Amino acid sequence: MRIERQSREFDKKEMFKMANDNHVLMKNLPDDTIVNVTDYVRYTTDDGKEVAIFYHTSIETGEVVTIATSSPTVIKTAESAYDFMGTYNLQFKLTRSQSKAGRTYMNFELV
């Protein structure tokens, strides 16, 4: 595993502990979910797969949940927003749309 980008210096043990304690795949979140990102890590696995982990703090409960995705579109959108805003403390809204061919796409917009 090779860390490509991160919002702060993460100890690998800390990163994996957070990911394993409370882990959700972004594709399993309901439509119109607001993701309140407090930290971010993108890494490449040993087999070359790129994965992004968003550390989400629930506004209602204060619970920290890690949300993982390997979607290149989501990763590119998030990193463009981070570069533009200059911060990793951002909120994104997840929505889904369907193509004419029936494929479901996840949209990831800055709130």
Listing of model-derived features with the role each one plays in the protein:
Residues 82-111:
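Compact mixed alphabeta submodule
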Residues 13, 17, 63, 76, ...:
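Polar/charged alpha-helical tracts
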Residues 1-61, 101, 107-111:
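OB-fold ssDNA-binding interfaces and closely related basic DNA-contact patches used
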Residues 58-76:
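Disulfide-stabilized netrin-like
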Residues 28-33, 74-93:
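Short nucleic-acid-contacting surface segments enriched for D/E, G, S/T with interspersed K/R
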Residues 50, 68-69, 79-83:
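Surface-exposed beta-strand edges and their flanking turn/coil or helix-capping segments
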